Every structure is written in structure tokens, then in C-alpha cells.
Regions:
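N-terminal leader/signal peptides at the extreme start of proteins
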Residues: 1-7
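Residues in soluble alpha-helical coiled-coils and helical-bundle/repeat scaffolds
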Residues: 6, 19, 23, 60-63
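Short amphipathic alpha-helical interaction patches enriched in hydrophobic/aromatic residues
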Residues: 28-31, 36, 55, 59
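Aliphatic-rich helix starts adjacent to a transmembrane/signal segment
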Residues: 31-48
Length: 126
């Protein structure tokens, strides 16, 4: 009687492969989350630049600041208010009112997110 050799992997081989995969994951996962955070910060910076440019265009066209954030949408300076990538909502933007009594309205806009960016500055101060 000939004994047939079973096909498959031994327990040692499986453990070695699992150890290699575990090592690769410990390297890759932190980098993935850092890249995700960097992407969210980039989106936030771009959204703020677009909104601030829309506020400036509104002021240049009408010599007044928009009274509320929705005025930028109503007057078609932006199609819609972007979703804050950190709060995941479009209504959490905080506005800075104009200090000039002759030109009241939204002078600047910031994120409503808590926490700090990768550079250590508060997201709400961007």
C-alpha cells in the first residue's frame, strides 16, 4: 500500500504567513490613517478657499458681505455649501461677522470642527 501525501499547508507554514501579514499590516495601517487625515485636511483647506473666494466675489459685486451663508448659494456664488470633512455636515461652518457697521454680514468662514490639524493648529482657526 502506498501512502498518498495529502495536499495542503502545514500549521507552521500558515503561522509564518500570518506573521508576515501581521507585520505588513502594522506598517501599512498607520500610514493609511495618516494619509486619510491628510486628505481630509486638504479637502477642508480647499473648501475654505472656495467659500472665502465666494464671499470676496459677493463683496466685489455688491459692495456688501452676504448676510448668511445661504446667500452664497441663493445668489449662485457656490452651487451648495460643502460638507465639512471633519464634522461631516454642511451646517457646522462658523462665520465671522464684519466689524464694519457700514458693511455688515459674513466676512469670513471657519470650520466648526474640534481638534487640531497635523501642524498643531486648531481646525476651527483655519
Amino acid at each position: 500500500m502506498r501512502r498518498r501525501r495529502e495536499k495542503g499547508f502545514t500549521l507552521i507554514e500558515l503561522l509564518i504567513v500570518m506573521a508576515i501579514i501581521g507585520t505588513l499590516l502594522t506598517i501599512a495601517v498607520p500610514r493609511y490613517f495618516r494619509a486619510l487625515e491628510h486628505a481630509r485636511e486638504t479637502v477642508l483647506r480647499q473648501d475654505l478657499a472656495i467659500l472665502r473666494e465666494a464671499i470676496d466675489k459677493h463683496y466685489a459685486d455688491l459692495t456688501e458681505y452676504p448676510d448668511v451663508r445661504a446667500a452664497l448659494v441663493d445668489k449662485r456664488y457656490v452651487r451648495s455649501l460643502p460638507v465639512d470633512p471633519f464634522t461631516k455636515a454642511a451646517d457646522t461652518w462658523t462665520v465671522v461677522a464684519s466689524e464694519d457697521p457700514d458693511h455688515v454680514g459674513v466676512r469670513d468662514i471657519h470650520s466648526g470642527a474640534e481638534g487640531n490639524g497635523a501642524d498643531g493648529t486648531a481646525l476651527a482657526s483655519w
